[in-house]
Amino acid sequence: PEHHFLSHRAAVEGYQPEPGKWVWDRDAGQRKVLLECRRMGVDFFEAFANSPPWWMTKSGSVTGDKDGRGNLRDDMIGPFADYLATVAAHYRDKAGLTFQALTPLNEPLGDWWKFGNKQEGCVIPPGQQAKLITATRKALDARGLTTGVTGPEDNRTSQTLNSLAAYDAAAWRA
């Protein structure tokens, strides 16, 4: 909130700037492109998150942890999954757009996600990834969404394989 180091193109506002407060008119440019794509006939949409909202992070920033380690607070795995599912349900209910896939994990092992970065991003270690994927599936189901849960979307194949090896059966089913 008081951090001003994100570049203009990367300063994407989240829909929940603080716990309990939703602001649905944020990120107008990307919303416009999304809905225009649908109008033009695109029929597959995947939602993704670069980072949890700042208040769900250990560092208080969407750019990463001060040491480049995991930045999602353990007590926020469920709330972050609920956040993602609420956004997906909002698009279904208010815009008539259903996401076919959702990934809560964009480059979750990137060693460049450090506090003060010019772009949002979040390290999420493999064990925590599995919990988040499972929680996201449950949150989507609770809202009647059939959206698939995907991830991790790592920068290197070796990172993806490392993450997948740590997933439990529940994460694989999600």
Task: Give the positions of each predicted feature.
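Active-site neighborhood of glycoside hydrolase catalytic domains
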Residues: G78-A101, P108-A174
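N-terminal catalytic cores of secreted or lumenal carbohydrate-active enzymes
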Residues: P1-Q100, P104, E120, I124, ...
